[in-house]
Design a protein with these regions (language model features):
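Gram-negative (and chloroplast) outer-membrane scaffold detector with strong preference
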Residues: 22, 26-36, 43-47, 86-171, ...
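Bacterial Sec-dependent N-terminal signal peptides
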Residues: 1-24, 247-250
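Residues that define the transmembrane beta-barrel architecture of outer-membrane proteins
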Residues: 33-37, 77-81, 135-141, 155, ...
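Short conserved catalytic/interaction loops centered on acidic-Pro-aromatic/His motifs
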Residues: 155-156, 170-177, 199-202
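Short glycine/proline- and aromatic-enriched beta-strand/turn motifs that initiate or cap beta-hairpins
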Residues: 20-80, 242, 248-250
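Conserved C-terminal beta-signal and adjacent last beta-strands/turns
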Residues: 182, 187-195, 200
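Predominantly the C-terminal beta-signal and adjacent terminal strand-loop region
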Residues: 197-250
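Flexible, solvent-exposed loop segments that connect beta-strands
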Residues: 51-74, 107-136, 169-179, 215-235
Length: 250
């Protein structure tokens, strides 16, 4: 047992020693530039967090008042992709300010659960589900502050925080629901700079949460098919969430 423990300790010490060895630095002065530019590509997962309205009353095409109870859910994180450009400005040794205009493309898959009382069997409740694909195309411009650790060899970890205003370019009046055109995301993330011979590669993982209620309540005015009203009125709030993995080439 002692030999095993000693072997493990020696292996850890050797690994740490190797990791601490200095190597030739690629692009040693790249972080001293007052500003630089680059491109970005990535993927993301997006979700909608709904606050459902509960039972509602609406007027159908015959002028009669009808009660309904429909809930909305995006029951999975839907993938998308991101492309954009960036400009980064050096504030100090450890702080940078980044502006990153980009476009986020994706499709959300929504499920509507219509809970109805069966007229043929007293007291029984049945559920009817409907689906909707909600395509999204966001144009955005993120404003981020980056705090970087000291560079060691050819890598430099960092954390970041910022805000990301977005504008939704998609929307279809025939959909059950629509999202508002604008949203503002809070961003928190971490990443690492890898200094390659000809450019700097920066993989970054960030978590994004929409600060605004993007559920478009005015969409009900555009609904001509009254049978859609139970689904259009089903929610009162919606907040967007994303997890983004982005690769910056600088």
């Amino acid at each position: 047992m002692r030999r095993i423990i000693l072997s493990i300790m020696m292996g850890l010490i050797a690994t740490i020693a190797i990791a601490q060895e200095r190597t030739v630095e690629n692009r040693p002065y790249t972080d001293l530039r007052p500003c630089h530019f680059g491109v970005m590509v990535g993927t993301h997962l997006q979700d909608l967090e709904f606050i459902n309205a509960g039972p509602v009353t609406y007027t159908d095409e015959n002028g009669a008042e009808v009660n309904s109870n429909v809930t909305i859910d995006q029951d999975r994180w839907d993938p998308g992709f991101t492309v954009g450009v960036l400009g980064e400005f050096r504030l100090s040794t450890h702080f940078q300010f980044r502006i990153a205009p980009a476009m986020y493309f994706g499709t959300r898959h929504l499920t509507f659960h219509n809970i109805m009382q069966d007229a043929n069997e007293d007291g029984n409740v049945k559920q009817e589900d409907k689906k909707q694909e909600l395509k999204t195309a966001y144009i955005s411009s993120a404003f981020d502050i980056i705090f970087s650790a000291p560079r060691f060899n050819n890598h430099r970890p960092y954390i970041m925080a910022g805000i990301n205003p977005m504008m939704n370019l998609s929307g279809n009046k025939s959909d059950y629901i629509q999202l508002k055109k604008t949203d503002i995301f809070l961003e928190l993330g971490l990443g690492c700079d890898f200094y390659l011979p000809f450019f700097k590669l920066r993989p970054e993982l960030k978590f994004m949460y929409g600060l605004m209620n993007i559920y478009d309540k005015d969409h009900v005015k555009n609904v001509k098919d009254k049978s859609m009203l139970p689904y259009t009125l089903a929610a009162k709030e919606a907040h967007s969430k994303m997890i983004a993995l982005t690769f910056y080439f600088e």
